[in-house]
Amino acid sequence: MEITDNIITKSKNIKLKEEKGKIMRKKSIWIAISLIVVLGLLIGTVGCPSPTPTTTAPTTTAAAEVTILYHCPWPPGIILSNNEINWMDKVEERTGGRVKFERIFGGTLSNLENQAVSIKDGVFDCGQTSYVYNPGLYPLGTVTTLPTIEDDTAVWAHATHEMIETTPELQAEFAALNQHYLFTWALEPMEMYSFVKVQTLEDFQGLKIRVHGGAALAAAKLGWIGVSVPWEEIAVASANHVIDAACVPCPITGRDAGLHTIYPYYVTPFPIYQFHFATVMNINKWNSIPADLQAIITECSAEAVDDALAYLDRELEKGYQDLRDAGVEWIDWPAAEMDKFRAQAGEPCWVDWVVQMNEQGLPGQKILDRFLELCAKYKASSD
């Protein structure tokens, strides 16, 4: 037993010495490493100058900049593009250049009829759409383009803008197309250019008349021959006498298209209906814009309604003079004929519209009543 115990004791002593040896070796290694590090620091301190102390400024994020791809189906320099150009210029200026529009004109990416879907699909971010060219996409919105719904363009523009801004059903039509509504801008009322000296409703019978929107509804009621001609083709169709008369906004928009050099007669005052344009933005693009910039864009959009009306006022007399210079003859549309038009093709079309909306499960009467209420509101404030 003593021999065994001695062997065990010696074995333990040997292991203990081995452990101590390992510990000593580890300490030696760490000491060596520490000396090397200290030596390196000393050399660096002697060999390199000390950096100049600096004060660290608070961390700031650069102001966000947004580029919006805008597309217009028309060339620049005419009413169909200038209203949006004026709005974009104002947005860029008021945001201090933080919002910039990349501008494409001339229908490179879409014609007017396809603008709504192109914006929906994100082909471009922003541009104009129209209830008249896309009635199936904005059925309730077409209340604003019914014949004789409102003769006063300023009243109509403000009522239409507020209608869209405050009516969930109309907002839903834009939302369904991935669009954020910005503003409505007005043209002159839709009147008539003609190759024939018309002075009564009966004089239009048998004529091929370019119509759309509210004018198409009225033509159907009156038994006129309505012809669909897109704006891009109207000058050629007129010059070639494919049509005998054209329901268009005459003194500015029609002048810009050169129609005053083609038609000999301008029938006025004959406000058949008001054409609708809205400027909208793809909702995903809108949601990507910082809130402070959204607020400025919204502010400029609200002002754009009046800016467009001011543009009309500035250009109207120039347009009239251009018509005179081209030798266009004014036909003074009799008030009695206008009254007949309202009775036969105005309110009867409103009734039909309500029925059509109801058949689609839409609140036609509610929307009609609301729009008439807003027109009355703005008419009263303008008196």
Residue ranges and their predicted role:
Residues M1-T67, A380-D383:
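Short, low-complexity disordered leader/linker segments with a strong preference
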Residues C48-P51, A62-A157, E165, E169-D383:
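N-terminal secretory/targeting leader peptides
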